[in-house]
Amino acid sequence: MKIVGAEVFVTCPGRNFVTLKITTEDGITGLGDATLNGRELPVASYLTDHLCPQLIGRDARRIEDIWQFFYKGAYWRRGPVTMSAISAVDMALWDIKAKAANMPLYQLLGGASREGVMVYCHTTGHTIDDVLEDYARHKEQGFKAIRVQCGVPGMKTTYGMAKGKGLAYEPATKGQWPEEQLWSTEKYLDFTPKLFDAVRNTFGFNEHLLHDMHHRLTPIEAARFGKGIEDYRLFWMEDPTPAENQACFRLIRQHTVTPIAVGEVFNSIWDCKQLIEEQLIDYIRTTLTHAGGITGMRRIADFASLYQVRTGSHGPSDLSPVCMAAALHFDLWVPNFGVQEFMGYSEQMLEVFPHNWTFEGGYMHPGDKPGLGIEFDEKLAAKYPYDPAYLPVARLEDGTLWNW
């Protein structure tokens, strides 16, 4: 099954996505997502200039060999740009293999391990009352797992806070320069438990409650925070501190039983190894688009299962619907599944990427169409050219650059 074509598309139907399409001599096509928020063009260039020319003439069935060739053959291994490009190739090849076998990807992986994929949504607001209103709306829609983020009094903006009432959270800003946001750890630590208290007092403990700290705290601050919120029984606290120094998670673990989720910025199993091996986390957040595609994520999930660490993959709308389709197949199959992030997509985005997934009662299903069950409208995508946008940076109130 020889590869005869590999094309890269950068489109912005509301936000920028990088899509790879691989075509075989049999006319079978596969799609892969290579989106890296704020760094889309470097990934597109890496694919166009390096990987795509070396795909032509290869056997599309040799997925593992192609993965190893691009990973080991480049010498400069890992990193978000390289791994996003490899991920897209891998995703597209699995799409092709499943289509050739005339079965949905989850069946090719080994079949369903569950009836549906539990997904968590995002609730947000400038005030606690706004968050409670948004929470009620998502609860009514049937979500069983809900992330809560809120504006902090005394801070103009913070991570997870939508720009307007009823709007989805969108961190990236258009233009050639990232927005700078002020951050106060003290104000955050003082306020956030009040948010959890209001949610639990209003809605009880029927839904799983999640919260993203987005790398903002030091290890001892995260330990104190996690211990102080134990009565609210969070499903997880996400990215409490930057994960470059993974040993620091031992300090957090020693002081709290609040579950920890980490890994959305990881690119390979090596990034995950220590945290999983020492059981310093409960959920691994790596995503198909940034950690080597289906092939890379299988290695991570299999390794995590040895230590009873479950998956909780990153999945906001800054990853394209192609990634979401692939993730739902992976989630339906993987034995040690925990939860899947899902923000949803605009109608405009889904017109460019017609999909086959369904949502009902807090659970999603990828559908039974052969392959990933996702398509790409190239003509419509061409009407939405790339539009520069960047994630913000954070500074402390004294001007010190901080972790966004």
From Swiss-Prot:
Q: CDD domains recorded for this chain?
A: RspA
Keyword Lyase in the entry? The reply is yes
The record, for Gene3D superfamilies, names:
Enolase-like C-terminal domain, Enolase-like, N-terminal domain
- Read off the Pfam families from this record: MR_MLE_C (PF13378), MR_MLE_N (PF02746)
**Origin superkingdom:** Bacteria
Which UniProt keywords are given for this protein, alphabetically ordered?
A: Lyase, Magnesium, Metal-binding
The record, for InterPro entries, names: D-mannonate_dehydratase-like, D-mannonate_dehydratase_GalD, DgoD-like, Enolase-like_C_sf, Enolase-like_N, Enolase_C-like, Mandel_Rmase/mucon_lact_enz_CS, Mandelate_racemase_C
Q: What is this protein called?
A: D-galactonate dehydratase family member RspA
